C-alpha cells in the first residue's frame, strides 16, 4: 500500500512547472520508496542506498582527493609550527596539546554558544531566545548531537575535543547549523511564506546531505574562522568525513572488517580510535550507514556554492534556510 501511494504521489508531481521543485519532490519520493523497501525487509545494495535513499553518488572519495586533503593539512601544520614526524603524528600532537579537560568544557561551550548565536542572528537568521544546554554523555555512537525540542546538545566525552573542535560542534549542531535550519523553516511555514514540505529538511532522506552540508559549513557561513587552528580543524573535519565515506563504502562493498575500517580511519583520517569505532558502528547500520556519505557530499556542495556566491550570498542563504532541497535541486536552483 505504501509503495502504491508513492506511485500515485509521483504521478501527481509530473505537472509541476518548476523544474527545481519537481526535481526535489521526485528525489524525495525515490528516497521514501527506498526506505519503504528497506524497512519492509527487502535487500538494497549499498550503491542503491546511496543514490536512491541518500541522493549522493555511489562512489568512494578518490585517492587523489584524499591526497590533496593531506597536502592541505601539511601546509596548515607547517604554518602552526608542527614540522617533525609524519603528518598523522603532527596532527595528533597539535590536537593533544589543545584538548579541553572535561571540567573546562561547560564554560567553553557557553562562550562559544553565545558567540555563535550572536553571529548567526546578525548574518543568517534571528534565533530569538532559543538556546541549547550542554548534556555530557558517554558510550554513544556520535561525537555530538542536538535534540531540538528538548534544547539539549549532547557532547560525547569519550571523544576528546579541542576548542576548535567544540566550535565546530556548536556551529554544526546549533548556530547556524541544524537548530537554526529548523527555526527558520518552521518560521517561514508558520508565516505562510513557504509550503509545509519545507519542514522535511529534518528527514533522513535526500534532505540529509543538505542538513550536514549546512552544519559542516557553519563556521564559514558566519565568518568564524579566527586563526590557523580553526582552519586546521576544518581541514581535519573534511579529511575525516572523506575517510568516513570511504570506510563505509569498503565495509559494505569491499568486505572490509570492523578492524580494517577502524585502522583506515586512524591511519588515513588521523582520527582518534574512539571516534573511529563510533563511525564504524554507524557505518555498519543498514539504514544509518549510507548517510555517512551525506557529510562529505553535502559539505562539498554547500562549500562550492558558498565560495562562488559572490554578491548573491542572500540568495544562497534563502535556499539554505527558507527552502528544502536535495543536492541536485539546490545546485539547479543556484545555477
Predicted feature descriptions by range:
Residues 1-335:
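N-terminal maturation segment of proteins
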Amino acid at each position: 500500500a505504501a509503495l502504491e501511494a508513492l506511485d500515485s504521489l509521483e504521478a501527481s508531481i509530473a505537472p509541476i512547472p518548476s523544474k527545481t521543485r519537481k526535481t526535489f519532490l521526485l528525489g524525495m519520493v525515490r528516497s521514501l520508496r527506498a526506505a519503504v523497501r528497506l524497512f519492509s525487509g527487502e535487500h538494497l545494495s549499498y550503491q542503491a542506498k546511496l543514490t536512491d535513499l541518500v541522493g549522493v553518488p555511489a562512489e568512494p572519495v578518490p585517492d587523489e582527493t584524499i591526497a590533496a586533503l593531506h597536502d592541505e593539512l601539511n601546509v596548515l601544520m607547517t604554518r602552526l609550527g608542527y614540522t617533525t614526524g609524519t603528518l598523522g603524528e603532527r596532527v595528533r600532537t597539535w590536537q593533544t596539546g589543545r584538548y579541553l579537560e572535561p571540567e573546562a568544557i561547560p564554560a567553553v561551550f557557553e562562550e562559544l554558544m553565545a558567540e555563535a548565536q550572536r553571529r548567526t542572528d546578525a548574518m543568517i537568521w534571528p534565533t530569538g531566545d532559543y538556546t541549547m544546554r550542554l548534556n555530557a554523555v558517554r558510550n554513544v555512537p556520535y561525537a555530538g548531537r542536538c535534540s531540538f525540542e528538548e534544547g539539549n546538545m549532547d557532547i560525547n566525552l569519550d571523544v576528546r575535543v579541542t576548542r576548535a573542535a567544540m566550535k565546530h560542534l556548536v556551529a554544526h549542531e546549533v548556530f547556524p547549523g541544524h537548530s537554526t535550519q529548523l527555526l527558520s523553516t518552521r518560521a517561514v511555514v508558520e508565516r505562510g511564506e513557504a509550503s509545509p514540505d519545507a519542514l522535511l529538511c529534518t528527514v533522513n532522506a535526500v534532505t540529509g546531505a543538505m542538513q550536514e552540508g549546512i552544519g559542516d559549513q557553519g563556521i564559514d557561513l558566519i565568518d568564524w574562522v579566527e586563526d590557523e587552528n580553526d582552519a586546521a580543524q576544518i581541514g581535519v573535519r573534511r579529511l575525516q568525513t572523506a575517510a568516513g565515506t570511504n570506510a563505509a563504502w569498503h565495509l559494505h562493498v569491499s568486505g572490509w572488517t570492523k578492524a580494517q575500517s577502524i585502522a583506515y580511519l586512524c591511519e588515513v583520517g588521523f582520527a582518534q580510535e574512539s571516534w573511529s569505532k563510533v563511525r564504524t558502528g554507524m557505518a555498519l547500520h543498514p539504514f544509518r550507514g549510507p548517510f555517512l556519505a551525506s557529510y562529505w557530499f553535502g559539505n562539498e556542495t554547500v562549500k562550492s556554492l558558498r565560495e562562488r556566491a559572490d554578491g548573491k550570498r542572500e540568495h544562497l542563504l534563502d535556499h539554505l534556510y527558507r527552502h528544502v532541497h536535495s543536492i541536485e535541486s539546490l545546485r539547479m536552483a543556484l545555477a
